[in-house]
């Protein structure tokens, strides 16, 4: 419910009447909880459309950037908002609070936001000189005049790669 209210508040602030057809809103969510799903559902900002950015801060907040106006706001949950008691109707519980009682809203600037972060087709594609994989949207790492993906450049990645699977192994499954 918190994410739904945040997204609705952002749409209201930017005077967006039809989120389904509006293409100039980008959302930045700061957690991987239900808030993120609500922002996708209400504001129609999708990861695959490059209109949703996720930052793993573990915080129930989201920022919204309107490309058309160049303005951005960050909406965060006030800490004095009580939790919905177990067994109560979540919608009814949170509807008793105004947006001002639920949220802090601040204008923000996005200093790390780049042209490459905008929705649309990749503006730049590079090939990693080590593994040969395509690196899109300015995410390549340049070292000594060479371009690498983050993994090959030695930056932390979330996995350790094992042996490549054959077509037979894939068909057989786990």
Residue spans for each PLM region:
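Short, flexible, mixed-charge glycine/proline-rich loop motifs
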Residues: 113-125, 138-143
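Cysteine-rich micro-motifs
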Residues: 142-155
């Amino acid at each position: 419910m918190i994410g739904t209210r945040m997204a609705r508040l952002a749409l209201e602030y930017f005077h967006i009447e039809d989120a389904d057809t509006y293409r100039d809103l980008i959302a930045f969510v700061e957690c991987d909880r239900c808030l993120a799903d609500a922002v996708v559902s209400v504001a129609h900002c999708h990861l695959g459309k490059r209109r949703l950015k996720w930052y793993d801060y573990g915080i129930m907040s989201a920022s919204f950037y309107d490309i058309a106006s160049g303005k951005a706001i960050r909406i965060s949950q006030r800490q004095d908002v009580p939790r919905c008691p177990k067994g109560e109707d979540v919608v009814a519980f949170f509807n008793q609070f105004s947006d001002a009682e639920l949220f802090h809203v601040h204008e923000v600037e996005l200093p790390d936001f780049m042209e490459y972060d905008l929705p649309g087709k990749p503006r730049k594609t590079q090939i990693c000189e080590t593994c040969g994989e395509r690196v899109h949207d300015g995410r390549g790492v340049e070292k000594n005049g060479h371009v690498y993906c983050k993994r090959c450049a030695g930056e932390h990645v979330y996995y350790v790669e094992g042996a490549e699977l054959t077509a037979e192994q894939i068909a057989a499954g786990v």
